[in-house]
UniProtKB/Swiss-Prot annotation:
Gene Ontology annotations for the cellular component aspect, listed alphabetically: cytoplasm
Location within or outside the cell: Cytoplasm
Gene name as annotated: lipA
Family: Belongs to the radical SAM superfamily. Lipoyl synthase family.
NCBIfam families named among the record's database cross-references: lipA, PRK05481.1, PRK12928.1
UniProt keyword annotation of DNA repair present: no
Annotated binding of [4Fe-4S] cluster 2, by residue: 69, 73, 76
PROSITE patterns found in the cross-reference section: RADICAL_SAM
Keywords from the UniProt entry: 4Fe-4S, Cytoplasm, Iron, Iron-sulfur, Metal-binding, S-adenosyl-L-methionine, Transferase
Gene3D superfamilies cross-referenced by the UniProt entry: Aldolase class I
Enzyme kind, highest EC tier: transferase
Pathway info: Protein modification; protein lipoylation via endogenous pathway; protein N(6)-(lipoyl)lysine from octanoyl-[acyl-carrier-protein]: step 2/2
Protein name as catalogued: Lipoyl synthase
């Protein structure tokens, strides 16, 4: 991240991004349960703006494979650093938390574990299986890393039969060297293409406000359409701290509606585009529509 990006002019947060914090007993109980079971959530680790709403409605996205990452994407609040071996008891604790929260749709994601031979794919599969064993009627969505393009690792996850396979491209390809220097845009598209070709419901997403143009956003939507992607999310990047890239622009809600209309016209059935949309925000909506 350049000094110029970090010192970009301050942009006042627009009114459509100001939300009421519905902190209540359910929020507190959800947070305490997650802590008691020694689990991580991406909601907390990434400082998601929807955390209070989601915890208050007994929903969470479970973050497996530890709380530190082997990569250092510029937008992300999850810390890079030394990582620990996978916790063999974690899949069962995720399943227990899902049962206690009475979840009907579970979202599982992870830090990126380039240190592991399979990138953590077997741990994903074990967690899916643990949730299914405890909650047979529960649908499961996984938000996976790119596994460094390892087709066998992807197949390990697919063999566990998640209901939704999510992998985010995050930003247009022209910005990867600055925003996702350890990732590869074409590799991410190939992962999505493979999952869709295998018959799975496939989802991806990106953020606005990191220096991209509207034309570039539409170009990403075109690329995702070409993979066969069923679901696309587009939301506004919010700077987690002063050490992260400054927000380059706040996209108006009307423009998000245009993104959604464009995607639907291109043939993507489910477009979720709004300033506060996040990859797993209201993730169960698609499953409800599908059923």
């Amino acid at each position: 991240m350049s000094a110029q990006e970090n010192s970009a002019p301050f942009l006042r947060i627009p009114p459509w991004l100001r939300t009421r914090i519905p902190c209540n007993r359910t929020y507190t109980a959800t947070r305490e349960l997650i802590g008691d079971l020694n689990l991580h959530t991406v909601c907390q680790s990434a400082k998601c703006p929807n955390m209070f709403e989601c915890f208050s409605s007994r929903t969470a996205t479970f973050l497996i494979l530890g709380g530190t990452c082997t990569r250092n994407c510029a937008f992300c609040n999850i810390e890079p650093g030394d990582v620990l071996p996978p916790d063999a008891g974690e899949p069962q604790r995720v399943a227990l938390a899902a049962a206690r929260l009475e979840l009907k749709h579970v979202v599982i994601t992870s830090v990126t574990r380039d240190d592991l031979p399979d990138g953590g794919a077997a741990h994903f599969a074990a967690t899916i299986q643990a949730v299914r064993s405890r909650l047979p009627r529960c649908t499961v969505e996984v938000l996976i890393p790119d596994f460094q393009g390892d087709a066998a690792a992807l197949q390990t996850v697919l063999q566990a039969r998640p209901d939704v396979l999510n992998h985010n491209v995050e930003t247009p390809p022209a910005h990867y060297s600055r925003i996702r220097p350890q990732a590869d845009y074409s590799q991410s598209l190939e992962l999505l293409r493979r999952a869709r070709a295998a018959g799975f419901t496939v989802k991806s997403g990106l953020m606005t406000g990191l220096g991209e143009t509207d034309a570039e956003v539409l170009g990403v939507i075109d690329d995702l359409c070409a993979t066969g992607c069923n679901i696309v999310t587009v939301g506004q990047y919010m700077r987690p701290s002063r050490r992260h890239p400054a927000v380059q622009r706040y996209v108006h809600p009307d423009m998000f509606e245009e993104y959604a209309a464009y995607g639907r016209a291109r043939g993507i059935p489910h477009m979720f585009c709004a300033p506060l949309v996040r990859s797993s925000y209201n993730a169960s909506m698609f499953v409800q529509e599908k059923n």
